[in-house]
Swiss-Prot record:
Pfam families assigned: Ribosomal_L18p
Molecular functions per Gene Ontology: 5S rRNA binding; structural constituent of ribosome
An annotated GO BP: translation
Keywords, in A-Z order: Ribonucleoprotein, Ribosomal protein, RNA-binding, rRNA-binding
Quaternary state and interactors: Part of the 50S ribosomal subunit; part of the 5S rRNA/L5/L18/L25 subcomplex. Contacts the 5S and 23S rRNAs.
Protein name as annotated: Large ribosomal subunit protein uL18
Its job: This is one of the proteins that bind and probably mediate the attachment of the 5S RNA into the large ribosomal subunit, where it forms part of the central protuberance.
HAMAP family per record: Ribosomal_uL18_B
Length: 118
């Protein structure tokens, strides 16, 4: 039986997360969620089950930008700055099943430029 688009997306995200768990070596995960109108990023410590830092296009300067590449880059910069304040510099990038292109790539590049290593 064919999977619905939603079920396919959930499976892709789970497959990505399983691979990341094997590669992470205890590093926190920079998780990205992309909707049609916003983009969200969280730095998550999976061992403790705690979100260390987060940012989205719903807050601050990014709220006026919408969900384009510029807004995604701003979110990447914000989440990187907040993670570094908490003492986190090394993370594993969890693209959540999304293709590494466009807004997801812009967020990742901005986070790298702001000082996160992945």
């Amino acid at each position: 039986m064919a999977l619905s688009p939603r079920e396919s997306a959930v499976r892709r995200a789970q497959r990505t997360r399983t691979r990341l768990k094997a590669l992470s070596n205890g590093r926190p995960r920079l998780s990205v969620f992309r909707s049609s109108k916003n983009i969200y990023a969280q730095v998550i410590d999976d061992e403790r089950g705690v979100t260390l830092a987060s940012a989205s296009t719903l807050e601050g300067e990014a709220a006026t930008k919408g969900a384009d590449k510029d807004a995604a880059a701003l979110v990447g910069k914000l989440v990187a700055e907040r993670a570094i304040e908490k003492g986190v510099k090394d993370v594993v990038f969890d693209r959540g099943g999304y293709i590494f292109h466009g807004r997801v790539k812009a967020l990742a590049d901005a986070a790298r430029e702001a000082g996160l290593n992945f």
